[in-house]
Amino acid sequence: MLKVDNSLYCALSKIDPDFSKDWSKSFFTTFINLKNTRLYFSEPANKGYIIFSYTSFEIEIVSIFINLKYRRLGIASTLLEKVKEFAIKNKILRIVLEVSVENNIAMVLYKRFGFIEVGIRQNYYKKKNKLIDAKVMSYSI
């Protein structure tokens, strides 16, 4: 189990300025300490992270974020590869995620990685009093 203390929460908040808006400390602590939840940091450290949960057959990427200054350097691809390696090692059959329909850059990355669109979640995200749909994407191992 990952020890969640103030320094971990602060580290994530430094990478992602909106982290504390999206995750309260108590919710994050509870979630990250679940048995089937993982958090990977980027290399080099403190440039990005990926959080996922998993079952015996599926991984759900809950959050992936790369600091704006370090985007388009392959960090997100490296994090996705780490999740894929985890899936292969644990004989997990697929990886799923949701992405805002407005996040074209992320959708291009996911499609290049091999994800396909499998559905839409209406009004999934809230951004400045506006509801935004999410595309559900899946990658088969």
Model regions and ranges:
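Short secondary-structure junctions
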Residues: 1-3, 116-118
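Acetyl-CoA-dependent GNAT
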Residues: 2-69, 80-82, 86, 90, ...
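Non-catalytic, surface-exposed connector residues within folded enzymatic/regulatory domains
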Residues: 22, 73, 128-131
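Structured loop/turn residues at beta-strand edges in well-structured enzyme cores
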Residues: 45, 90, 116, 130-132
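A short, glycine- and basic residue-enriched loop/turn
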Residues: 53, 58, 102, 107, ...
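Conserved glycine-rich acetyl-CoA-binding loop
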Residues: 64-81, 88-90, 94-95, 100-108, ...
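C-terminal "cap" of GNAT-fold acetyltransferases
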Residues: 93, 100-103, 123-141
